[in-house]
Each structure stands twice: as structure tokens, then as C-alpha cells.
From Swiss-Prot:
Protein location: Cell membrane
InterPro entries named among the record's database cross-references: UPF0756_TM
Domain of life: Bacteria
Keywords linked to the UniProt accession: Cell membrane, Membrane, Transmembrane, Transmembrane helix
Entry protein name: UPF0756 membrane protein ESA_02180
Transmembrane segments: 4-24, 51-71, 86-106, 112-132
Membrane topology qualifier: Multi-pass membrane protein
Pfam families with a match to the protein in the record: DUF441
Principal location listed in the UniProt entry: membrane
Annotated Gene Ontology cellular component terms: plasma membrane
Family according to the record: Belongs to the UPF0756 family.
């Protein structure tokens, strides 16, 4: 029996590998394992809660330097005194807002996710880009197409 979904997942894993995007490669391979085992019963939960869990893990990793003391509080306070840091804060606020629009768009139009993934992988492979978050890319798409 020919499974086109499995073929697509394998192609995405291959693109991730070729483009040195280990996050895509590992993610797709994990999804293949889930798909081909009894763990597939977890797909509804992953589809519903996956982005939230991922954002929580990402937030933990971003805040870890503050919690560990690697980023001293004095550095945080100085961020409000330097114009470059203030620009970084403004960009951070904008990107967070954009990511929120991306989450909404990906939830309302899941077909866009494949395009974002392929675009990210191609950008990494062909233009030596770095795999930026698909949430931000989805946010930009939402601004361009006027959705969410």
C-alpha cells in the first residue's frame, strides 16, 4: 500500500537533513515514529497542544540565563538606558505580536504550515539562511494576506 503522507514526511526529513536543519529533520522523524506506532493516538493532543508546549519550552530556554544568574539583573536594568537595547526591546515586542498573529493564522489555515516549512527549509538550503520560527513567518504571511 502506497502512503503519500509518509512519502511527504520522508521528503521533508530529507530536505531538513540536506539543509542542515536538524530541528526539522528530528521533528519529522519523530512524527513518522508516532504515525507508525500506537503512539498515533496522541496526534489529536499534539495537534491541539503542540504549539503551546513548544512555546513553553522556548520561553524556558530564553529565560534560563536570568534564572541561572548568567544574565545579571544589572544587565537587564541597563537595557533600558541604551538606545540599541531599547530598539531590541521594541523589535522583541513587535516579533512577539507577529508570532501571535502567526499562531492564529496557522490554527485557522493549517494548509499554510506546509508552505512555511518548505519555504524555511529552502531558505536554509539555498540561501544559507537560518531556520527562524515558522510562527514569525506565519505572522508575516498574515500581514501580507490580511488574515487574523
Amino acid at each position: 500500500m502506497f502512503d503519500i503522507t509518509l512519502l511527504i514526511l520522508l521528503a521533508l526529513a530529507g530536505l531538513g537533513f540536506v539543509s542542515h536543519n536538524m530541528a526539522v529533520t528530528v521533528s519529522v522523524l519523530v512524527l513518522i515514529v508516532i504515525r507508525m506506532t500506537p503512539l498515533s493516538a496522541w496526534f489529536p493532543w499534539v495537534e491541539k497542544q503542540g504549539v503551546t508546549v513548544g512555546i513553553i519550552i522556548l520561553t524556558i530556554s530564553v529565560m534560563a540565563p536570568i534564572a541561572s544568574g548568567t544574565l545579571p539583573t544589572s544587565t537587564l536594568f541597563h537595557a533600558f538606558l541604551n538606545w540599541k537595547s531599547l530598539v531590541a526591546i521594541a523589535v522583541g515586542v513587535f516579533v512577539s505580536w507577529l508570532g501571535g498573529k502567526g499562531v492564529a493564522l496557522m490554527g485557522s489555515q493549517p494548509s499554510i504550515v506546509a508552505g512555511l516549512l518548505v519555504g524555511t527549509v529552502l531558505g536554509v538550503a539555498l540561501f544559507r539562511g537560518v531556520p527562524v520560527g515558522p510562527l514569525i513567518a506565519a505572522g508575516l504571511v498574515s500581514l501580507l494576506i490580511g488574515r487574523q
